[in-house]
A protein has these predicted regions:
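His/Glu-rich zincin catalytic helix
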Residues: 1-83, 88, 104-107, 117
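Acidic/histidine-enriched segments that form metal/cofactor-coordinating
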Residues: 2, 86-128
């Protein structure tokens, strides 16, 4: 049985390696940070857009606007978005903070083109 009254030993890490992202500016002027971390066959794409709580005119406006992105686009209704992401083993996280709204896509590398199509539609063609 574990004795919870005994404090565990504190171990200092031998070496802490912090990987720096590669910073690129796309032809359209959008900054891109690329971090190749690990051998996993998963890609994470984070989109940061100005539009957090500091820019909202009504309480919760930034949060609800961001969350509505998955509710439908010109090409896909909410059920089709969920179905396509689920089929390809991908998922979305939608959130907002003080300054920014975040859209994060996790996708298996082999299905990235298909899931990027859904992400593009969500960001460029929302219907709410």
């Amino acid at each position: 049985m574990l004795n919870r009254s005994d404090q565990p030993r504190i171990l200092e890490p031998e070496q802490l390696v912090v990987q720096r992202p590669e910073r690129i500016k796309l032809p359209n002027g959008v900054p891109l940070s690329v971090l190749n971390a690990g051998d996993n066959e998963v890609t994470r794409i984070d989109l940061l857009m100005a539009g957090g709580r500091w820019q909202q005119k009504q309480p919760l406006q930034a949060l609800f606007t961001n969350r509505m992105l998955r509710e439908g686009t010109r090409r896909y209704d909410a059920a089709r978005i969920a179905e396509k992401l689920d089929y390809y083993g991908a998922w979305l996280e939608l959130s907002s903070a003080s300054e920014y709204a975040y859209v994060t896509l996790y996708s298996l590398n082999k299905y990235l083109p298909q899931t990027l199509d859904v992400l593009e539609s969500i960001v460029k063609e929302p219907v709410f």
